[in-house]
Every structure is written in C-alpha cells, then in structure tokens.
Amino acid sequence: MQFTALLAALGAPLALAASIPAAAHNHTMIDVQLAATGNSMIKATITNTGDRTLNLLKFNTIMDEHPTRKVMVYQDGAEVQFTGMLPRYKMSDLTPEYFVNLGPKASVEHSFDLAATHDLSRGGKITVKAHGMVPTAEENATTITGHTLYESNELTMDVDGKQAAAVEQAMGGDDSTGVIDKRSNIVTSSCRGSQLRVLQTALSNASRLSRAAASAAQRNPSKMREYFKTADKPHRPEGASRFLSVARESSSGSTGRTTYYCNDNRGGCHPGVLAYTLPSRNQVFNCPSYYQLPALNNRCHGQDQATTTLHELTHNPAVVTPFCEDLGYGYQRVSALPASKAIQNADTYSLFANAIYLGC
C-alpha cells in the first residue's frame, strides 16, 4: 500500500499528510468516522461536509478497495506491523471507476478487516485512526485539480487474537522464488519474453538516477527545498544516504536485499497499479501496466519504469529505514508536504530523481 517508532512519532498518515498548509482547494471538506463492526472489522463513513460535489480519487486513501494502508494501528504505543501492499498507481488517463462522486452532505461507507493487513494475533487493545488527503477532480471529470484533508476519530478496539489470526492475509501466498538473478534478487523464473531485460534496464537506470540524485541532495540546496521542503541538516545527508541505498540495491554488483518479481503472483495487480511492494516481506512485484511505461520519461514529473522501480525500492525496509510510504502523489501533492513528511514519501524521491535527470 505500512513501522518504526520514528514514523509513529512523526504521525505518518496512511495516504497524505494532515499538516498541509490550507488553501481554497485543499481545506478539510470531508469527515471520516471509524466504527468497529466486528472483532477486527472497521466501517469508515466518509461524509462531504462542504457545499459542492466532490469527485474523490480512491487511490491510497481510506476508500481504496485494495489491501492498502488505510489506517494506522497501534498497540502499547507501538505500530502494529502492516502486512498489506504499497502500490504505485498510474496517475495519467484516470477513469471514472477510480473515483467516488460525493454530493454535499452525502456519505459513503467502506468496510475492511484490519486482520487481513495487520498482524493482530497477539490480541488485546488496539488504537486505530486515519488521517490524510484525497486528490479531487471536478464533478464528472477525472483530471486532478486539488485535494481535501481528513482526520478520523480515534477508535479503541479489544481484539481476540485467535479470531484475528484465523483471518486470511490479503497478501499471503507462496514465497517460493525459483531462479534468482543477483541484481536486487530478480526472480528470473517470473519473467516472460523481454521482461527480464526490461527490468534489468530499469534497475540500471534507477541506480544511475539515484546516484545523481544523491549528489544533488548534497550540492543543490534549492532543489532540496523544492522537493523535500528543507535543505537543512539532517535532511540533506539523510536524503543522499537513501538515494545511495537505492542505487546500491539496484546496481548489478549488489547481492540484493529485496526480491523483485517481473510479474504478480499474489493478486495485487489491480487496475491502475503499476507495481507494488510488500514491506513486511521486502518483495516488489511489477504489473502489466509497468511494461507500458517508457524506460525513461523525457517529461518533467512523468512516470516511467526507472522511477517506478526507484519508488518501489524506497518502500522496502531492507533498503530504506524507516521505509517510505505513499504520503503524496505527483508534483502538486508532493509540493504540499511539510519537510517531516516529504522525507518519508516515496514519490518525493522518484520526482526529485526525475527532476535532476531532466534538469527540471
């Protein structure tokens, strides 16, 4: 779609940061209320509190229908491990089914089982909350023009661990790997046709872009301020270090700490998903739409194979610690994140690397 105490201290949201400066197009216009409807079942009621219709993009939000990170779950002050998926969605050519159209004062409900994406086998009291931002389009349109913030109530639940453990994990499946390529541990047996060559090229390009970005993070304070919202220490060396870690992981000389699949074997390649990561397993899966992207985009902030791979590698705790989340997609949303969130946002790294490569 999921952590360490540092992320908990930062109050990392599931989708986009709640501490974004208010503007006419991004103030709070929806209310989210969480309610327990079973041992580990949650019902989220999303209400449009404004006076105009909202067209809400579901990707990586409380309304996402896939096993993504919708809420933060805490037990005894620590985050409960997230076992779901962190996808990168294709943000161009959006279609109406990716949106929820919500009229003024209207509500929509979305239910999900926490035990399908979290390890709740310990049982006991947990605290659940959600906050973030939803990209918005005009009514009956699919072009993103703004965003709206939300923050839910804090919900306390007493979970039966045995019942929770009996819930099937949404992203469970066979962990067998087959033939492994040294570079980022590519499972070559998962590749068909030219896919292995395409992925190897993407990893090579991701390494090259990451090394250039690492250098720029140290030497180009204006770009750091543009994307990471600060050029102060410790952000510059931290950003550079993370880029170098991605570069090492994606280079041909790496022994590989992640396992990379050319194709999906866990059912996570839903419509709109380019690739996804299971951070609890340090596994990355490409989807069919990944292979429709250009190897490298010649458009500033455009999506491509190299930066999608870079994006996904930042989701893996074996590469980046604490690993990055999906707190903001696209240049406008990334630009709205404060420094504490930008450093933890996967798309910040892919957009920065793209900007350095193209001289944006």
Curated annotation (Swiss-Prot):
It is found in: Secreted. Disulfide bonds join C191-C262, C269-C287, C300-C360. Its cofactor is Zn(2+). It holds the Pfam family Peptidase_M35. Glycans are attached at N205. It catalyses: Preferential cleavage of bonds with hydrophobic residues in P1'. Also 3-Asn-|-Gln-4 and 8-Gly-|-Ser-9 bonds in insulin B chain. Residues 1-17 form the signal peptide. One of its GO terms (molecular function) is metalloendopeptidase activity. Binds 1 zinc ion per subunit. PANTHER family: NEUTRAL PROTEASE 2-RELATED, PTHR37016. This is Probable neutral protease 2 homolog A. The gene is NpII-A.
